[in-house]
């Protein structure tokens, strides 16, 4: 499971698609992130009629949540690609709200996994928009995971049944 990742890419080296339609001030306030944890803000590309760069909370909040910050209902930060379409929590986002999350590495147990050339890659994800009774909107996302490939399997003991690999994409 991908529970930590990093984005150590400097702003000028980020993929061009991230810099086409981004939040005001991102270029001057952007900082690399050495350790991104669930509930942290993450940089995301989404498509709602046009490709847009934005920040979202990493940890999926359902649109029908009464309290998005409740400690009683943890927010999933991963969704298994094999079952995401079947899960009520994720099915609408799977159909209509997919996203890409830039990363330069992710962590599995005590290992850091990155590209050999240190380039940015993409984690596939889904996102959701929660709206408060007052009309305040909060966007959140989670990373899609899949069965681990032969490079990642050795990073966990055989008894570890939850092992999944973030869905990485080449764009």
Predicted regions and their residues:
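Short, His- and charge-rich active-site/binding loops that engage polyanionic ligands
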Residues: 3-98
């Amino acid at each position: 499971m991908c529970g930590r990742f990093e984005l150590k890419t400097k702003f000028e080296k980020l993929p061009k698609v991230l810099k086409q339609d981004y939040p005001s001030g991102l270029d001057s306030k952007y900082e690399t992130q050495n350790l991104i944890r669930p509930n942290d803000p993450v940089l995301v590309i989404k498509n709602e009629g046009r490709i847009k760069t934005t920040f979202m909370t990493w940890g999926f909040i359902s649109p029908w949540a009464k309290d998005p910050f409740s400690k009683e209902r943890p927010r999933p930060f991963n969704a298994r690609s094999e079952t995401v379409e079947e899960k009520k929590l994720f099915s609408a986002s799977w159909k209509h709200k997919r996203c890409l999350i830039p990363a330069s590495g992710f962590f599995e147990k005590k290992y850091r996994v990155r590209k050999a050339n240190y380039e940015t890659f993409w984690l596939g994800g889904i996102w959701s928009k929660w709206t408060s009774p007052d009309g305040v909107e909060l966007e959140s996302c989670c990373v899609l995971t899949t069965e681990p490939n032969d490079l990642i399997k050795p990073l966990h003991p055989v008894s570890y049944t939850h092992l999944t690999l973030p869905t990485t994409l080449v764009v």
